Each structure stands twice: as structure tokens, then as C-alpha cells.
């Protein structure tokens, strides 16, 4: 029996001190026990909540983002040779407008990727999806709600930054909504629209190459070590892990 347990028993079960002091001690012990239990439960809930947020972020963005003044074709060959890298997908990003049939529009970031990989690479919950003959795009639930859009609706994508110099009109292309996703954290549901590569090339006339590469690693990989390996093999690269990109969010959660 340790010293603290011995003192507690002497205090609680000493027959010479039956009365208010014993009752007060019992209430104090119960109070401390309940407080400790509540703290343990709160920490457990927060840890579980943090874990879910991490899964959502990694599922939407990947483990690592690679960018910078690099040769993307050569960089992708290098990534293929790194054992810890399970998968990657290059992308082009551009802020533009999405417009519904009533000419209501919303400014949003277009992410041009190999659209056939949107469901296999990104771990996103789709509340609706379907296949169509027209080029398909995928957008968030909030964006769809604000523009009153559903799967199968036709919309127009416009890129004001790539407007025709002669006519002064932005490039515009018609596509169809192939899926609506629901990420449920941050502003992801109203932040990005995934569009096909060929649509991106037609829309972003002033873009000359990729903007970055989303990278997926193994489940228990050491991201810091993988980041160092990539930096050593790819010159002039700018690399960020998911924790670095969202450092402020998780710092605030841990306060």
C-alpha cells in the first residue's frame, strides 16, 4: 500500500473522527473523481475529433503538396521511384466563375486534374454522382446549394484571367455536374471545383504547365523524412505536409 492510500484510509475510516469532516472529505473525493473522469472523456473526444479532421483533410488534399520552380514531368518520374510515395496526381489551379442556367454565378477555385482519378485518389464522400457524355465536374455541397444545382445540371465555367484580349470576353465552356461531395470541414464544400484536364487546358489559355502535385504516402509513413527525400531529389521544390498547411488550425484546437 502506498503512502497516499494509507493517509486517505486513515482519514476516511478513522472512527474517532466521524462527522462533518469525514463527510466533507467524501464529497471532495467524489468531486475530484468526477472532474478527472470528465477531463479524460473530454480529451478522448477531442483526440477522436482531431483524428477525423485529419482524415478529412488528407482525403481532400493528400499527405504532401509539391510545387515550386520545378520540371513537373521529371519530378513525377522521381516520385515514382520513391518507395514511400504510393500515389500522386498533378493539378492546375485557377480562380474562376461557375454560372448556372439563370446566369447566377459564384467565384471559386477550379482544380484541373485527371478527372477519372477523382474518386480513387481523393477520399471524398459523394452524396450524389452519375456518369454523362458531356465533360463532368465535381463540386461541393455548399456551392451546389447556393447555385441551386443538382447532379446532371449543365453549368458554364468562365476564366476572367484568361479573357480574349481582342474581344475582352472571358473564355466560357459548358460542362455537366457529375457529382456533389460533402467534406464537412473548413470551407472545402465551397472552395474547389474539380474539372477535367482537357477542360482546364481549353479554359486556362495563359497557363503553361502544372501548378503542383498532390502526393499520397503510406498510412504510417514519416512525412518529415519523405519531405527531406523529395527535397534532396527535386531541386527548387516547395514542399508542404498537411500539418504545415493547416498548422494554425491544429494549434488553435490544442489550446
Over which residues does each language-model region extend?
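Conserved, well-folded catalytic cores of nucleic-acid-processing
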Residues: 11-15, 56, 60, 158, ...
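Hydrophobic, regular-secondary-structure patches
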Residues: 37-109, 129-133, 231, 238
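Short amphipathic alpha-helical coupling elements at transmembrane boundaries
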Residues: 6, 10-13, 51-62, 247, ...
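Short aromatic/hydrophobic contact patches that present stacked aromatics
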Residues: 63-65, 136, 212-214
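Mechanotransmission and gating elements of multispan inner-membrane complexes involved in transport
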Residues: 169-255
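A structural signal for hydrophobic secondary-structure junctions
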Residues: 81-208
